[in-house]
């Protein structure tokens, strides 16, 4: 299984597609196995958290739905992280180093500062189980412009909201320090813990 080269289709996606089609093939070839109506759908853009943005739930019409993914044999996941994305754009001011005292605003250094203000032990490397984290996925910049890209994850909804509030407060404090909006935060939710919905529909 491969893509046409114009889309992202990693080995985990290929394995998932293979598993699903193999299961369908098995049911078709073994009509003696009793089962209800089975519907299959494939969604794009999983890696950017937009896989079901245009999925027509009403048209699909089913009582129960499962996402099939790679994992241990027999494993069923019934909960997941609450997920958000934080994109921070920083605009600096480049001045000749020889005359930059109290004038230059180094966007790259501000980006480093923002990242340093986040909890040191709340990264994917330092957490496990139900512990949430901030994950810096991209960092680039120079004196005039810098960019930070984070994913924020937490199982608990209240802790999730606190994490978003905290990164917002960091950006606000940096802007207050410089007396202008040197850093602009674009913060948005991507998806939520499905356990809350399952608990509402027991």
Which residue ranges define each predicted feature?
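Acidic/histidine-rich catalytic neighborhood of metal-dependent amide-processing enzymes
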Residues: 2-79, 131-133, 137, 148-155
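A short glycine-threonine-serine/GTX helix/turn-capping micro-motif
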Residues: 7, 95-102
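Beta-strand secondary-structure signal
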Residues: 39-41, 85-89, 147-149, 184
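Short, solvent-exposed amphipathic alpha-helical segments in soluble enzyme
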Residues: 56-59, 82-83, 105-106, 165-169
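His/Glu-based metal-binding/catalytic segments typifying zinc-dependent metallopeptidases
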Residues: 78-79, 83-84, 88, 97
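Short, solvent-exposed loop/turn segments at secondary-structure boundaries
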Residues: 78-79, 100-102, 196-198
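Metal-dependent amide/peptide-bond hydrolase catalytic core
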Residues: 107-202
């Amino acid at each position: 299984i491969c893509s046409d080269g114009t889309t992202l289709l990693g080995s985990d996606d290929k394995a998932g597609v293979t598993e699903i089609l193999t299961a369908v093939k098995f049911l078709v070839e073994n009509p003696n196995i009793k089962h209800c109506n089975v519907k299959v759908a494939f969604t794009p853009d999983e890696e950017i958290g937009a896989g079901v943005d245009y999925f027509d739930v009403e048209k699909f019409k089913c009582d129960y739905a499962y996402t099939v993914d790679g994992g241990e044999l027999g494993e069923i996941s019934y909960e997941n992280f609450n997920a958000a994305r934080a994109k921070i754009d920083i605009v600096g001011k480049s001045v000749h180093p020889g005359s930059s005292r109290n004038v230059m605003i180094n966007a790259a250094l501000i980006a480093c500062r923002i990242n340093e203000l986040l909890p040191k032990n709340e990264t994917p490397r330092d957490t496990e189980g139900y512990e949430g984290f901030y994950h810096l996925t991209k960092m680039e910049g120079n004196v005039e412009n810098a960019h930070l890209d984070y994913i924020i994850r937490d199982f608990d909804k209240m802790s999730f909201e606190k994490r978003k509030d905290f990164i917002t407060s960091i950006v606000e404090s940096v802007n207050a320090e410089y007396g202008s909006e040197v850093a602009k935060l674009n913060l948005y939710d991507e998806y939520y813990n499905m356990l809350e919905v399952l608990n509402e529909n027991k």
